[in-house]
Amino acid sequence: MAIASGSWVATVNHHANPHSFTSPTKPIFFLSQKPHNFHVCSSRCSMVLEEDEKKSPSPKEDKWPFFEPGPNDLNRVLSRFLRDPETRKLSSEFYEKAKENSELRTTKHLISYLVSSKSWDLLVSVCEDLREHKALPDGQTCSNLIRSCIRDRKFRITHCLLSVFRSDKSLAVSASDAAMKGFNKLQMYSSTIQVFDRLKQSVGVEPSPGCYCRIMEAHEKIGENHKVVELFQEFKSQRLSFLAKESGSIYTIVCSSLAKSGRAFEALEVLEEMKDKGIPESSELYSMLIRAFAEAREVVITEKLFKEAGGKKLLKDPEMCLKVVLMYVREGNMETTLEVVAAMRKAELKVTDCILCAIVNGFSKQRGFAEAVKVYEWAMKEECEAGQVTYAIAINAYCRLEKYNKAEMLFDEMVKKGFDKCVVAYSNIMDMYGKTRRLSDAVRLMAKMKQRGCKPNIWIYNSLIDMHGRAMDLRRAEKIWKEMKRAKVLPDKVSYTSMISAYNRSKELERCVELYQEFRMNRGKIDRAMAGIMVGVFSKTSRIDELMRLLQDMKVEGTRLDARLYSSALNALRDAGLNSQIRWLQESFDAAQTSTSKYSNTKNTGTLS
């Protein structure tokens, strides 16, 4: 028998077959017949241990087990004992004791060496030889070997080794379990299914709970939920131990598959079955069930499961809490959303920005901006951390309530926290500057926005055009208009209306007509705001034909006239003496639609007569 390590060189001298092996790194151990001489050479000592053949056992008793070398301490102790003549006999006995380790240790080290040296084909050959001699290693070694092959992407070797290990029932199960787990990690679910099918084809081999867990996980990942349920029924029929560590995962997977198949109530029955059998529930199981019932808007069941999970300290999924919050928002139970936040805080679960913005936005739409602001301030007192979207909603609420100082303070706080590229927040602040006639602040904000790498959108351009148009600063408005087009931001209806309105105030009516024609060429749809401006423009410029075309387009597009617009158009036609056009206008836009004044109706009737 030869032993070699980093500091050992061992030589075995046999009467017929001398063996020697040296390795600077890894030890390899071979089984040989009884040695006559055993020479130990070490960097620390060089001694010879002579065995007395008279005391050697008979051939019948010559059973040398496999040897597992001890740690470096064993080398040091043996060397020290061999130096002293008085302890040489003791060292021999100590060495014999060391050889009495498990008989499979040598196989483990040989396999470990072949794996580390990447000798895959030789590894398969060794395992086949071990099968021939019925000396396969234990289940743990086989499982580690399979995991190593999959980790190094040696899938052909993996399947070859699995075929070798299937000769032993216990090894077949443990090795297949390790293989399926490895394939699932690599998302090779078809390979997992293949391994499970071959395992079931083996005679007298029953898959373990772990094998069922891996195969159910694979089918769930590829969307075969019906197959998961079938395997679960098969698992229960096998009467395997429900107290296995994989049982909780198995029940979680089947509940998830049932919920995804729209069978949430059956999943709830499976949960009750778990409780009856004493299988501990997991946070993933509760999360999946709560999400399923929240999406189905089953409020009572969702509340029950949510409270149950909170009582068992299994609230660990913020996404599930978001589903519950959205359910309450859709149902209009806004106050209950605050209870969800309180439960999350109690469970030390972070309240995400998605949850906060859903709550604040829900209050804003259903209860008004004042309530939304109160909820936001309450959340901040609860030490919830707002994100970019929540900040934007709160800033908009403050602006709508005309609390401009708070809106600006909140915007500054938002920028300091690093949320300096939120276009919606910039738009709200820009609109606020326009309403408060702070044109210079708006221009500075635009410059900062560009400096921070945030591109202005159509809302910001519209706000700037509108505020400069109202201030009669047409040069600045035209500059912004051209900049918007250079940035390839297409003008919308509001953009054109603001520009036309600005030029109308400055009495540049021809420019108004040019912009209107450009708007119509771009297939813009007329609204009452633009129609009101253009009726006045066409009337002032005596463009009666274009006025009639405008009114006809409005009728075709279904745009309704208000009293002011109706009166303006009617007066323009009357001044031009176009009675037939007046009659058409009255027939096309009746008094019920326009809600015109009694004075206008009376005056128009007198004109027709």
Curated annotation (Swiss-Prot):
Keywords annotated in UniProt: Chloroplast, Plastid, Repeat, Transit peptide
Keyword Kinase: no
Superkingdom as given in the UniProt entry: Eukaryota
InterPro entries registered for this protein in UniProt: Pentatricopeptide_rpt, TPR-like_helical_dom_sf
Location, primary (coarse class): plastid
Gene Ontology CC: chloroplast
Chain segment of the transit peptide: 1-44
PPR repeat boundaries on the chain: 103-137, 138-168, 172-207, 208-242, 247-281, 282-316, 317-351, 352-386, 387-421, 422-456, 457-491, 492-526, 527-561
GO molecular function, one term: mRNA binding
Keyword Membrane among UniProt keywords: no
A biological process from GO: chloroplast organization
Family classification: Belongs to the PPR family. P subfamily.
Protein name (database record): Pentatricopeptide repeat-containing protein At5g13770, chloroplastic
